[in-house]
Amino acid sequence: MNRNFDRKIILEDGTEFYGYGFGAKRDALVELVFNTSMVGYQEILSDPSYTAQAVVMTYPLIGNYGMCNEDYETDRPTISGLVVREFNSEPSNFRAARTLEDVMIQYDIVGIAGVDTRRLARHIRDEGTCKALIVDAQTPSIACLAKMRSTALPTNQVSVVSTKSPWISACANPKHRVVAVDCGIKHNIIRSLNARGCEVTVVPWTVTAEEVMAMHPDGLFISNGPGNPEDAKPVIDLVRALRGKLPIFGICLGHQIIALAYGASTYKLKFGHRGGNHPVKNLQTGKVEITSQNHSYAVKADSLAGTGLTVTHVNLLDGTVEGQKCAADRIFSVQYHPESAPGPQDSAYLFDGFIAMMEGK
């Protein structure tokens, strides 16, 4: 072990990786996942879907361009930790307002650098997503393992990240009124809707069908978010109550929630999909899209039979369901992130499809 290494990350199977700390200096019990994106660490760090998780970045250099005021995906990051090979404390970017470490300290995000992140990512790929503890290097392993065995990871994180009261994101010359259920919505989703002439009313995850309809929306959007979709029962009930009454579009967690509302089921993937280069085939056009993804759960393909939902997109790496629709109810959803941030913009047309649906086309 390098003598300069003052921190370690220990996995629930006892595997240890040593490094040096940056960001917040505290112990952190986390769910450990990995992301293969080369850039976009700021958007990843501020994505509410990573709540209570620590992200292993497989790209070796993180922090090179600092943190830019325009690139946050939430006002207050809720990620627990960041694991990197090397972080840059002196970024070179005219847009940078702060360093990565400054932001991590402000929001109590634990960091560990000097780790062989590609080896760690392979371990997660082979053994699966797991609990991990980031602690001082001298902390006895026996004590760490005992703490992980006795402490459960938090659940129902949607309740943590959702807005507490409705708010409006206006746009010039609005053509449509969209109600967006905030399960952990990213800023660029709202920007993508605003750019297409939608006034967006962002509402808490506990909103009722009656409250939504009282706003007289042209469409309903169900956002991304953290955790198990089965924990989001109020949103499942909302979709069940409003399906067929107005156009509905869901992304990521919203995709899973829609499946559950129709009677399908979901399951947890071994290590999830997180990165900016996942190939997805659009079964309606035959085209392949390169997509940005961040999720632990997926819809069971065989559970869709008899629900009224049909598969529209599939993942070309593992065959999982990436899109679904019920044309009769004017509802559709995708498992990936068409708003990118970070990632490719191959799937931005889905927002246009939502607009067309609200216009009755």
Predicted feature descriptions by range:
Residues M1-E210, A214-M215, P229, A341, ...:
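RNA-binding accessory domains that recognize and position tRNA/RNA substrates
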Residues V110, R177, P247-F249, S265, ...:
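Proline-centered loop/turn at the N-terminus of a beta-strand
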Residues D116, C252, H295, H337:
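Active-site glycine-centered loops adjacent to acidic/histidine catalytic or metal-binding residues
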Residues K175-V179, E199, P247, I290, ...:
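Residues that mark the start of a beta-strand
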Residues R177-D182, T291-S292, F332-Y336:
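Active-site-proximal beta-strand elements of phosphoester/diester hydrolases
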Residues G219, S223-I290, S296-A301, G343-G353, ...:
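Cysteine-nucleophile active-site neighborhood
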Residues K287-D329:
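Catalytic beta-strand/loop cores that center a nucleophilic Ser/Cys/Thr
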Residues G323-G360:
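A glycine-centered loop/beta-turn motif at secondary-structure junctions
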